[in-house]
Amino acid sequence: AVKTDAFRHPDTVAASVSEDASRLLWDAELLLRKVYDIHGSDSESVDIIEYYDFDALKRQRRENYRYMLEHCPKSDAYTIVFPYLDDATVPSHFTLYAADRGKFKEYLSQNGIHATSYWPVGPYINLEGHTDCAYIYDHVISIPCDQRYTAEDMAYICRVLKDF
């Protein structure tokens, strides 16, 4: 017999697909619940989720970013990617375009500053004719400014940037 929905009434096909999708959804949901039950969660993680002061998190991130914007020295070695902080943004990183990212990242590392280079060019990505994209891939670097850091940390980063 030919297994095709071409000769079945559309309502029957839709019902069948809907039933299959529903069954898959609930199978996946039950599997996730089993995984959660097996691994559970520790009380500290539950407390963090239930009681964490997210307003303080947002405030600290914004203060750190604002500090970097106000105190980061101008340099030919890098350009600030997002030079304005609007009211809705809660950044986790201070992102720059570095003229020589490798040298810049190594310098930061030598001074105890972790910086991240995101988005490596994948093997199937062709940047030919996309010079703006290629520039971003080759130059973007991010320095964390999240709630773990203080104004003193941001001041240290700015001093290190000044000496680059």
Explain the meaning of each model-derived region:
Residues 2-164:
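PLP-dependent aminotransferase class I/II
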